[in-house]
Design a protein with these regions (language model features):
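Acidic-enriched, low-complexity/disordered segments with a strong bias for Aspartate over Glutamate
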Residues: 11, 15-18, 33, 54, ...
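N-terminal accessory/assembly segment that mediates macromolecular interactions
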Residues: 61, 67-123, 203-261
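Short linear motifs in intrinsically disordered
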Residues: 30-34, 57-62, 121-127, 184-185, ...
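Preference for solvent-exposed, low-hydrophobicity sequence contexts
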Residues: 150-277
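Acidic/polar, low-complexity intrinsically disordered N-terminal segments immediately downstream
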Residues: 8-92, 156-171
Length: 277
């Protein structure tokens, strides 16, 4: 549903006692209650720009009064900062004090005046009927993302993501078969891209994010080139759309699983993809 009613943004706003200003104030209060009402927190996959850095896992614990704790797969420390929900051309969530979990992708750096094309401010979209997911739209990137209610503690969740990330960071996956094609894959952890070489074709990069289950392909069903559908979809490998590669702990080590369940060894590579980790 759109926010908490059938009214979205400024369409068909009620009148009288529920005139627009009061309506929006009530909606902002409901969103605040929703965010602060889950002690475990909320998880987000941050999607900068055109997914050139893949997706970054961040978990938040929102508190009454505007305090927020942020846990990022990039950072070892917990970030304590503040947030605010306000109205400007839609109800927005902004992280209004320094927050390195978001800022490292949103703040200008050196010659990159646009930063890494990430967001620290978002417009609220739809809230699911069960109130377990909240759509966010990046104010800068315009990318659609999801806040998802956590069923476990935020720090515990991020630590599990880190375990998966560390297991495959800068590693190659043994040759396997997907969609009837022989496939070689390597994980570029720093920029969160999966290098995929199908048969004799040139390698290509697929944007990914890590999860507690493995490697997730971002925008698997999107066209590689919107102007040329013949190039196929982002996750297209032979007859199959690659959406996920599961990563499973096996004693003290890990292995991957193909979409068909085939076991794939995780191997060291001839190149150090982990430089500047």
């Amino acid at each position: 549903m759109a926010l908490f009613s059938s009214c979205k943004m400024y369409d068909n706003l009620p009148e009288g006692d529920d005139k627009p200003a009061l309506y929006l104030t009530k909606e902002m209060g409901k969103l605040t209650d929703l965010l602060t009402g889950n002690a475990n927190g909320w998880r987000l996959v941050l999607l900068p720009g055109s997914y050139q850095y893949g997706g970054i896992n961040i978990a938040f614990k929102f508190h009454k009064g505007g305090a927020v704790e942020s846990y990022s797969e990039d950072l070892d420390e917990v970030i304590h900062s503040s947030y605010r929900i306000y109205n400007t051309a839609g109800i927005r969530l902004t992280f209004d004090t320094r927050n390195p979990a978001l800022g490292r992708y949103a703040e200008p750096r050196n010659t990159l005046l646009q930063g890494l094309e990430g967001d620290f401010e978002f417009t609220f979209g739809d809230v699911s009927a069960d109130q377990d997911t909240i759509q966010l739209i990046g104010a800068y990137s315009r990318n659609k993302m999801m806040l998802v209610r956590l069923k476990e503690d935020a720090e515990s969740y991020i630590n599990k993501v880190k375990d998966i990330r560390n297991a495959v960071y800068g590693k190659a996956l043994a040759t396997t078969t997907i969609g009837g094609e022989e496939v070689k894959m390597s994980v570029f952890g720093l920029i969160r891209q999966l290098q995929v070489k199908v048969g004799s074709a040139e390698p290509r990069l697929i944007p990914i994010n890590f999860s507690t289950e493995g490697i997730e392909v971002i925008g698997a069903d999107d066209l590689i080139d919107d102007s040329d559908a013949s190039q196929g979809k982002v996750g297209q490998i032979g007859t199959e759309i690659l959406r996920q590669i599961k990563v499973v702990k096996d004693g003290s080590t890990y292995h991957a699983l193909s979409p068909s369940g085939q076991k794939i060894a995780i191997q060291s590579t001839d190149y150090d993809f982990t430089k500047s980790k």
